[in-house]
Design a protein with these regions (language model features):
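ATP-binding pocket architecture of kinase catalytic cores
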Residues: 2-110
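An alpha-helical support segment within catalytic cores of ATP-dependent transferases
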Residues: 80-158, 171
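Catalytic activation segment of kinase domains across protein kinase-like and atypical kinase folds
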Residues: 166-183
Length: 183
């Protein structure tokens, strides 16, 4: 049956990692917040993700920065009880830890160091992408982060998690849409 709708299909050969399941869940959570335009997840399986098609416009991505900034401010008002997400997910193809701090602390600097920096560094070590000098520098950074971020008193909030110019688009009406989150 041809409904006349156009879709966007992301597909991989081996869907065993769970990346599309995580991406679909992240898109749904962002969509529920209603703060930013998010494409509808039409269907999802281990090796595919089917999304509504967004017709891209010809406007520069710079043209919507103010609107996107206001939308992010609204999104970041959606608070949770803890930093993280109910399940681990992916930053691209790389596993991302979202579990609460192993020290029981529920502050942003601790979560950021343990779940973002140290976790990704451990993957780099495991895969042979680092050396002792870099590891020593990272240890210095881990110890400096709490001081650098002191006084921020950030509350847990819903984040896109992988924002860069390739993960948002501008539709034909000049409105921004977010894609490919790592919430």
């Amino acid at each position: 049956m041809n409904s006349g709708r156009v879709f966007f299909l992301k597909q991989v050969r081996d869907g065993s990692s769970g990346t599309f399941e995580s991406e679909a869940r992240g898109l749904e959570e962002l969509r529920k917040a209603g703060a930013v335009r998010i494409p509808e997840v039409v269907a999802q399986g281990p090796d595919y993700l089917l999304l509504e098609w967004i017709v891209e416009g010809k406007e520069s991505k710079d043209s919507c920065m103010e609107e996107l900034g206001f939308q992010f401010a609204k999104l970041h008002h959606f608070s949770g009880e803890i930093f993280g997400f109910p399940e681990d997910n992916y930053l691209g193809d790389s596993l991302q830890s979202n579990s609460p701090s192993k020290n029981g602390s529920i502050n942003w600097p601790t979560f950021y160091v343990e779940n973002r920096l140290q976790f990704q560094a451990s993957l780099a070590v495991k895969n042979g992408y680092t050396n002792p000098e870099l590891q020593n520098l990272l240890e210095l950074l881990y110890n400096k982060i709490p001081e650098l971020l002191s006084g921020t008193e950030d509350k847990p909030s819903l984040l896109h998690g992988d924002l860069w110019s390739g993960n948002y688009l501008i539709d034909k009406n000049g409105r921004p849409w977010l894609i490919d989150p790592a919430v």
